[in-house]
Amino acid sequence: MSNCNIIIVGAGGHGRVCADVARRAGRNVTAFCDPAFSQATEILGIPVLANSERELFDDWPDATELFVAIGDNARRLAIASDACRRGIPLAVLIDPSAVISPSATLGDGVIAMPGVVVNAEAFVGRAALINTSAIVEHGARVGQGAHLGPGACLTGDTAVGARSFVGARATLLPGVHIGDDVSVGARAVVTRDAGDRSRLVGVPARPVRELRLIEPT
């Protein structure tokens, strides 16, 4: 475990949950950075900086890692990637209740929330968010900036593309691959591959456009 301090970008609800995870993992969160909360001096007892990310990055403190706690997948990944280009280290946050296989790989800036399971030889890309009790089974791949909602399940050898979202309790069946910028609705069951920018809902999951085409007139 790193002994570096952490600054969290984003002080909304997600940022506060990330701070809780960091503290349970024994990490020291020295500040939130969020201009939207410029009137707050502290949140959860943690100082709030009203700087923009750019201002913060231009004067980055020593022995400090960054964690980006922004719900928007594209923006979270963009900020994390900008930090990496500037040589700013990204924290990896793993709740003590999460189970991570020693053969799994977690990229920079990933969070594994309470109850998460990441099994053998799974891969989770930079700035991906694995939310409460989500499961990433053996050999599954989670793209950069993706978000698995609470209770989502990626069964064996599945793949989720960059910046994609898998909703609460949704499931990808074994071997299914979905592309970049895909959105899977809550409780959907994805039984076949889906291309970039698909919007999938239902059991079995179908593209929203396809569902509209088969609606009775």
Show which residues each predicted segment covers:
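Short amphipathic alpha-helical segments
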Residues: 19-22, 78-82, 124, 195-196, ...
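Phosphate-bearing ligand-interacting subdomains
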Residues: 39-99
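Short helix-capping segments at alpha-helix termini
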Residues: 26, 84-88, 192
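Short alpha-helical
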Residues: 13-16, 74-75, 105
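Structural signal for interior beta-strand "rungs" in well-ordered beta-sheet cores
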Residues: 92-208
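Short, low-complexity, intrinsically disordered N-terminal peptides in bacterial proteins
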Residues: 1-5, 181, 213-217
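Hydrophobic, well-ordered beta-alpha structural blocks that scaffold small-molecule cofactor pockets
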Residues: 1-49, 56-58
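Short, basic/aromatic-enriched C-terminal tail that caps enzymatic domains
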Residues: 53, 200-217
